[in-house]
Amino acid sequence: MEKNLSSRDDDALHSLSASSSYDSVYDLLHYHERGNGLTINGKPSYSIEDAGEQITRDNVSWNGSNVFGKSANLTFKFLQSARSTPDGDTGFVKFNAAQVSQAKLALQSWADLANVTFTEVTGNQSANVTFGNYTRDSSGRLDYGTQAYAYLPGSGSASGTTWYNYNVDNIRSPDKMEYGRETLTHEIGHALGLNHPGDYNAGEGNPSYNDVSYAEDTRQFSIMSYWSEKNTGGDFNGHYAAAPMLDDIAAIQRLYGANMTTRTGDSVYGFNSNTDRDFYTATSSSKALIFSVWDAGGNDTFDLSGYSNNQRINLNEGSLSDVGGLKGNVSIAHGVTIENAIGGSGNDLLIGNGADNVLRGGAGLDPRFSDRCR
């Protein structure tokens, strides 16, 4: 447990007994402990590393089979025509402007994490990753079933292709925090070599969270999962992640290595963000955040000052935080140090990580705990 206690003001300390303060800190520090032989929801709990291996269990990337930590320079393409998908679906529709824009943001979110670059090609040029829509199933009927699918890397003609059901509203009009953007990021994950965390697929039987291989197979930990974050105690209030989550970061870095050029300066996440990433940027108190941070260096800050909710903010790597009225919606990847945090106008709990933390509670009664805190 963190040893030294300091506070924004004495009132915060007087308002909470020492016992209740430390109980609150203990609860947050041990918020969804995982791995180490634990069982959660009757399922084995996997560490972040074990989950990353599970999500990449086919051990394939654009570098071949059983090649790990090697960079890849990839191409992508928005198809202009197709007779049918590899599954036989028909009624091709090319990506519209909104889909193109959101797909490029989704590609960027993967490239930030690992040593993967994406270059767009057009015309008759072949590409590693392709995008297209379909509207009808193999029998020619309008398809309202499977919403999207993709193929892992390989040498076949289907490899790296991603397909989307244009009959679905939020597939046609994807946006941050909604299902359409999440779907783009998910399918690109497949095209890069990531599996679902468990052996299930849409349209094959009736799988549920009861069938998962390990407890953390939820959207709280992986954008590749089908299952609600509520199964592991999170609550995104109906929103979806736009970018890879905690276990996805471990997975993609296992295949291609960690991108150590990403945000090496002093980065701000949340309000007043300078990351140039929509999913790391809070624009108003009514807009939610859902993200896992990958950051390669600098003196970095979580600025959550615009929220009035009571927040629990933990700066330790691998941790979960409750931000902006959601639960377990912000996490920090292994190997990442976030030095500073700014709370909002609610009663926030802030926990540092042993770096030279600056923890500012804002308004409200805000106990702060860190090994070294200013």
Regions found by a protein language model. Name each.
Residues G156, G160, N165, D175-K176, ...:
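Low-complexity, polar/charged sequence tracts that form flexible coils or short amphipathic helices
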Residues Q220, G265, L289, G298, ...:
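Cysteine-rich, disulfide-stabilized extracellular repeat modules
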Residues F271-N274, R312-T337:
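Acidic/polar low-complexity surface segments
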Residues G297, G306-S308, E317, I342-N347, ...:
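Extracellular, beta-strand-rich repeat scaffolds characterized by small/acidic residue-biased motifs
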Residues F236-A288, A296-T301, G306-R312, L326:
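Extracytoplasmic and endomembrane cell-envelope/extracellular-matrix remodeling and assembly machinery
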Residues W110, V293, F302, I313, ...:
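Hydrophobic "rung" positions of tandem beta-strand repeat architectures
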Residues M1-F95:
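Disordered inhibitory propeptide/activation segment of secreted metzincin zinc metalloprotease zymogens
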Residues L29-S71, A98-Q220, Y226-D235, S284-A288, ...:
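Metzincin-family zinc-dependent endopeptidase catalytic domain
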